[in-house]
Amino acid sequence: MAFNFNWSPLMADAGFYTRAQDLLTAALNKSPKPPIIVDDIVVTELNLGSNPPELEILEIGDLAEDRFRGIFKMSYAGDAVLTLKTCVQANPLNTYLLTRHPFTSPQPLAAATGLTIPLQITLSDIKLSGFVILVFSKQKGITVVFRNDPLESLKVSSTFDSIPFVRDYLQKEIEGQLRILFMDELPAIIHRLSLRLWSTEYSELETTCDQVTNPSLEGPGQDPLLNPPQDPVDSFGNVLSISEIASLSLDSGVEMHSLFSRKNALRIAALTDSQRTLSLFTPSIREVVFRAWTGSIEQADGPSGLVSPMSPPLSRTQSHITVASAPLSSQDTASVASSQSRPGLPSSGYSGYGLSLGAARHSKAHARKRKKRVIDLRPHRKPTDDMASISGESSCTDSTITTTTKSAASVYSSSIIPEENNDDDPVTPPVSPVRNSTVRRRQTLRDRIVDRDDAERTNIRRPPIPAEFGHEFPLRPTQPLPSNEIDRNVTSPNPKPEDSHHFQPPRQDTAPIRNIPSAPLGPPAPAPIPASASAYPPEKPTYTQSFPPSFMEVAHNGSILEQAWMMKMASEIARRIQDENSSAMGSYVGSGSGSGGFWDRSHTPPPAYRH
């Protein structure tokens, strides 16, 4: 079976080409276009050529007078020509930014400006080869479906043929669009054309739809002055009267004024004034936005120098609202100061009312903490006359425990805390009486001891304690020992018992204790002792003559616990004084011999309680 194609009538019919161009234009603009094409694609020329396609029958499914269905193999290598016109984007950065999310783009101004160039593309030397399913019916028209991609090759000629990479890019993009056209859009175009040729009902329906969608421009036009706004103004903001509106017409030779509603004009003016982004005297520059003015000072320096009372400045608007609010109470001053940096409420009076309520409700809760009272029901011993007589000495010993807390805690496992008198508040004792009393008495006791020592001060002074001992007392400037004192200490390291009362070692001015001789009683040494060991006392010193009588009187007059506590404190004080004296004497003697450092000496253990 053979078919004879009559290709010449298609070329002779001018109406066919017009309808085909319109359908192709609609099809090319319907599909998603690449971002480089920024204008509509218009088909300006369409010519099917003189060479018809070649068809090979593969299968016939249905054959009748008014219908036909078959599968063909089509081959076309004719002289058809298709010319398109559009506009393309020549700036690749603009194309890149259009295809990306605005959050990830750097938002350039000048570099991303579009550069539109007109483009004319001519498609020729089209070669097609594929399998076609053809269905014909007088009632339903012709349906052509391609089972595979029919496009083999195509020649693209454009205005950018002199630029190789642009030519290759256009070639690839147009081939991709034509493949979509043959597979999706071309069957629909052929079907609509066949319905126009053979179905009169469809042609009448399509004509009616065109009249509805594209109404004719013939006839009188609509007069915009027929229904003017209620409060019209001209372009300068002047209100127009009814007579002036009636004098205006579309056919008048006078210049046409733009009519605006006065309410809308005021809203637009307020919006423009509040933003302050452009000045009226600034020349218009494309793709440029000026920054907003930051305050009234910059507004006054601007070209106009006018500030509209209708709209406050753009910056710190809430601050102006807060300043204009009503005066608040004294409790709300802190709240008002902190609220000036936050957005204010719509009503200044209401904001002050809310602040005063909040401040009054929470002012008492945060003013002071509630005092927790603890009632002490334990029995307290009343001070006796003997204890009252030696109150000065007991206060001295109370202060010494604070200075020797660290050393005493490491040597003795138990400590006895003296009782205190709470005469100020007998019902509510303080939380920590020992700590508070020591803090209060420390400075006063030191001054008392310094005054007591000033009366007994002699001219003999020793050098300051080395820094390696880590004493907490501030050192006063001291004078070096005389040479005769140093020689006497070196030659007689162990004084006789009868001379122990007259011997006084070098004193430390800043220690809060009295002068206590550090050389205890002991038998005289038969052999001379080295200078490095001359400052160390024997292991078991006697405390009867090494402590002031005041300590012993307190111990005899007090109870057993007080006596034990006093003896413990006295032994601790004696140990510290002996260490200080031995370090001072060793530093002077060892400096001449070159031996006897701090780490070379061994400290004696603290003495035990006296039995």
From Swiss-Prot:
Domain note: Lacks alpha-helical transmembrane segments, suggesting that it resides in the membrane via beta-sheet conformations similar to those predicted for other outer membrane proteins and porin. The SMP-LTD domain is a barrel-like domain that can bind various types of glycerophospholipids in its interior and mediate their transfer between two adjacent bilayers.
Mode of membrane association: Multi-pass membrane protein
Biased composition (Polar residues): 325-342
UniProt biased composition (Basic and acidic residues): 374-385, 444-459
Gene assigned in the entry: MDM34
InterPro entries according to UniProt: Mdm34, SMP_LBD
Residue ranges constituting the SMP-LTD domain according to the UniProt record: 1-195
Identification of the protein by name: Mitochondrial distribution and morphology protein 34
Superkingdom of source: Eukaryota
GO molecular function, one term: lipid binding
Basic residues bias spans: 361-373
Signal peptide span: none
Entry similarity comment: Belongs to the MDM34 family.
Function summary: Component of the ERMES/MDM complex, which serves as a molecular tether to connect the endoplasmic reticulum (ER) and mitochondria. Components of this complex are involved in the control of mitochondrial shape and protein biogenesis, and function in nonvesicular lipid trafficking between the ER and mitochondria. MDM34 is required for the interaction of the ER-resident membrane protein MMM1 and the outer mitochondrial membrane-resident beta-barrel protein MDM10.
